[in-house]
């Protein structure tokens, strides 16, 4: 049964949660650019509405799809674990509002509503309409550049494995279980070199490898300038480079599971 709705509408969520014992909260607005109000109203307030709806309908278990970016502090993460604290500042609204959402879900955990948050990193696989299409589109238009020296390693999450982790997390949510009220990184055991993976993907699409390069420092500076310009001119479109994007494309992000 499908019930379309908006996470900003608490009443709709309550109706959808009626008679349900487990909720998987996956909905969010992704992206590296846009007004704070949009990210906050959906990612944070929407999640708070989900928690409220679960309590109203006496749902027993809530699994949140979070993100490793909630603990991203601007520095590389190499074999990082869940001891990483939330940073005090964020480079864009998405990780900030997702952090607030994750914190709300974990704080809500009690004997009536058991909660857990999963942080899958770079989900990819069949029916992807976000990551892979954007990479291929940029490559075909000649706008894809390697940022940094290409040595950065990242943890990835195949979509079916990420889905399985959510089901396993729900099963593990039992009274007194160690996972209750906790957050966990979710990814494949071995990291890969980001730009090597991108070039393999492009080859499968019949495209040449990325040859144009830009240093991480230059990309960061360009991103900072573009963010300022887009802010001043109130441009709604996404800048081709931001500080967050420069860091994500040039730094290692690997996690110990």
Label each residue range with its predicted role.
Residues 194, 244-257:
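Active-site loop of classical SDR/Rossmann-like NAD(P)-dependent oxidoreductases
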Residues 45, 49-93:
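Conserved Rossmann-fold NAD(P)-dependent oxidoreductase catalytic core, especially the SDR/UDP-sugar
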Residues 4-45, 53, 73:
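NAD(P)H-binding glycine-rich loop region in Rossmannoid oxidoreductase-like domains
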Residues 172-241:
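Mid/C-terminal beta-alpha module of Rossmann-like enzyme folds, strongest
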Residues 71-72, 92-93, 113-134:
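Flexible, glycine-rich beta-alpha linker
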Residues 89-119:
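Active-site Tyr-X1-5-Lys
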Residues 96, 100-101, 129-134, 148-172, ...:
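Substrate-positioning beta->alpha
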């Amino acid at each position: 049964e499908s019930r379309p709705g908006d996470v900003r509408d608490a009443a709709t969520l309550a109706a959808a949660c009626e008679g349900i014992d487990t909720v998987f909260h996956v909905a969010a607005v992704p992206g590296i650019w846009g007004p704070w109000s949009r990210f906050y109203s959906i990612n944070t307030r929407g999640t708070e509405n989900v928690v409220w709806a679960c309590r109203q309908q006496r749902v027993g278990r809530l699994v949140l799809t979070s993100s490793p970016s909630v603990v991203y502090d601007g520095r590389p993460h190499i074999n990082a674990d869940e001891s990483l604290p939330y940073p005090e500042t964020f480079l864009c609204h998405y990780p900030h509002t997702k952090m607030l959402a994750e914190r709300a879900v974990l704080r809500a955990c009690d004997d009536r509503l058991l909660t857990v948050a999963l942080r899958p990193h770079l989900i990819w696989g069949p029916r992807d309409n976000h990551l892979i299409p954007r990479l291929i589109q940029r490559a075909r238009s000649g706008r894809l550049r390697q940022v940094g020296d290409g040595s950065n390693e990242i943890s990835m999450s195949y979509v079916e494995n990420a889905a399985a982790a959510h089901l396993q997390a729900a099963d593990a949510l039992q009274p007194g279980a160690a996972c209750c009220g906790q957050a966990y990184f979710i990814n494949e055991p071995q990291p890969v070199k980001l730009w090597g993976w991108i070039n393999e993907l492009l080859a499968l699409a019949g495209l040449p490898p990325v040859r144009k390069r830009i240093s991480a420092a230059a990309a960061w500076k360009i991103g900072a300038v573009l963010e300022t310009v887009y802010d001043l001119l109130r441009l709604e479109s996404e800048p081709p480079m931001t500080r967050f994007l420069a860091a994500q494309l040039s730094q290692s992000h690997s996690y110990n599971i």
